A protein has these predicted regions:
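HhH-family (HhH-GPD) DNA N-glycosylase catalytic core used in base-excision repair
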Residues: 1-188
Length: 188
């Protein structure tokens, strides 16, 4: 049996996410927006809770199309609040809409959100060499810089810990444990 990070075992959806997505470098703006929203939703919750509702979030937020989400009105907020498959937190729903508008402004300024966000790690994946989760930080200098800049640009629910979780998910950092078979596979 191959070694993994261990956090995805026992839950098929978490295992699939660990094995196929987590830490894989993202260069698609729609997926960047999806991770920004979902990591914000996760604040105060477990990733497992959010991941098990991911399809409902995709449905509620027009597959995380930032152009569509940026146009949402109060009626859309109410529609999402009534969606039975998501965690109904008005502040987080309103943050997703606000973040979509800020996301589009970043795209316009930099040509893509991808180009902007990868700038925080010098354009290449930061490869960590953790042997246990106790070595892994909750935030880093890069996630603090990202958080500060995103907030300056109008984003919300983007504190340094949320930004670090986003960086892990979107592959800006490789935080697979060195014993995990994915540690080498996701390095790009």
């Amino acid at each position: 049996m191959r070694e993994t990070c261990g956090w995805g075992t026992g839950d098929p959806l978490m295992t699939a996410y660990h094995d196929a997505e987590w830490g894989v470098p993202v260069h698609d703006d729609r997926l960047h927006f999806e991770f920004i929203v979902l990591e914000g939703v996760q604040a105060g919750l477990s990733w497992r809770t959010v991941l098990h509702r991911r399809d409902a979030y995709r449905e509620a937020y027009d597959n995380f199309d930032p152009v569509k989400v940026a146009k949402y009105t109060e009626a859309d907020t109410e529609r999402i609040m009534a969606h039975p498959g998501i965690i109904r937190n008005r502040r987080k729903i309103e943050a997703a809409v606000k973040n979509a508008r800020a996301f589009l402004a970043v795209q316009k300024e930099f040509g893509s959100f991808d180009k902007y966000v990868w700038g925080f790690v010098g354009g290449k994946q930061k490869i960590n060499s953790h042997k246990s989760f106790s070595e892994m930080p909750a935030e880093t200098e890069e996630s603090r810089a990202m958080s500060k800049d995103l907030k300056k640009r109008g984003f919300t629910f983007v504190g340094p810990t949320i930004c670090y979780a986003y960086m892990q998910a979107a592959g800006l950092v490789n935080d697979h444990l060195t014993e995990c078979y994915r540690w080498k596979e996701v390095q790009r």
